[in-house]
From Swiss-Prot:
A GO-annotated cellular component: cytoplasm
Major enzyme class: hydrolase
Reactions performed catalytically: glycyl-tRNA(Ala) + H2O = tRNA(Ala) + glycine + H(+); a D-aminoacyl-tRNA + H2O = a tRNA + a D-alpha-amino acid + H(+)
Compartments where located: Cytoplasm
Function recorded in the entry: An aminoacyl-tRNA editing enzyme that deacylates mischarged D-aminoacyl-tRNAs. Also deacylates mischarged glycyl-tRNA(Ala), protecting cells against glycine mischarging by AlaRS. Acts via tRNA-based rather than protein-based catalysis; rejects L-amino acids rather than detecting D-amino acids in the active site. By recycling D-aminoacyl-tRNA to D-amino acids and free tRNA molecules, this enzyme counteracts the toxicity associated with the formation of D-aminoacyl-tRNA entities in vivo and helps enforce protein L-homochirality.
Protein name as it appears in the record: D-aminoacyl-tRNA deacylase
Molecular function GO terms recorded: D-tyrosyl-tRNA(Tyr) deacylase activity; Gly-tRNA(Ala) deacylase activity; Ser(Gly)-tRNA(Ala) hydrolase activity; tRNA binding
Residues spanned by motif Gly-cisPro motif, important for rejection of L-amino acids: 137-138
Organism of derivation: Halalkalibacterium halodurans (strain ATCC BAA-125 / DSM 18197 / FERM 7344 / JCM 9153 / C-125) (Bacillus halodurans)
Quaternary organization: Homodimer.
Length: 146
């Protein structure tokens, strides 16, 4: 499982012109799931994301987590994270999990984040989405479960 994590001042996701998820201060997560991923991967990433110290403290050091600063999560499924561009001119998405495997794990990750006390907004799984954000920093990290 891969997550591109972006610290954001604000973000929203729309589907067919309708806002389906929006946050102020917090994290935008682009979540990719592959064939061998399990609920344990989802739990591991939820813990890592909730406690990763990437927000600045009063001294200007990255010393606080999204939980510490009262931030929220905007979680978006993103199968294209498993696109392989090494051959040809069109990405190969064979490493991305099928929706019937990926969607329950996506929901599990979001549920674990909520259980850790975070407010979670989501996109719509499998939909074409427009994502807008104001990247804070910018701080962008790739977090993987394996």
């Amino acid at each position: 499982m891969k997550v591109v994590l972006q610290r954001a001042k604000q973000a929203q996701v729309t589907v067919e012109g309708e806002t389906v998820g929006a946050i102020d201060h917090g994290l935008v997560l682009l979540i990719g799931i592959t064939h061998g991923d399990t609920e344990e991967d989802a739990r591991y990433l939820a813990e890592k994301i909730a406690h990763l110290r990437i927000f600045e403290d009063e001294g200007g050091k990255m010393n606080q987590s999204v939980k510490d600063v009262g931030g929220a999560i905007l979680s978006i499924s993103q199968f294209t994270l498993y696109g392989d561009c090494r051959k040809g001119r069109r990405p190969n998405f064979m490493e991305a999990a099928k929706p019937e495997h990926a969607e329950p794990l996506y929901e599990t990750l979001n549920s674990h984040l909520e259980q850790l006390g975070l407010h979670v907004e989501t996109g719509r799984f499998g939909a074409m989405m427009d994502v807008q954000l104001i990247n804070d920093g910018p701080v962008t990290l790739l977090v993987e479960s394996k």
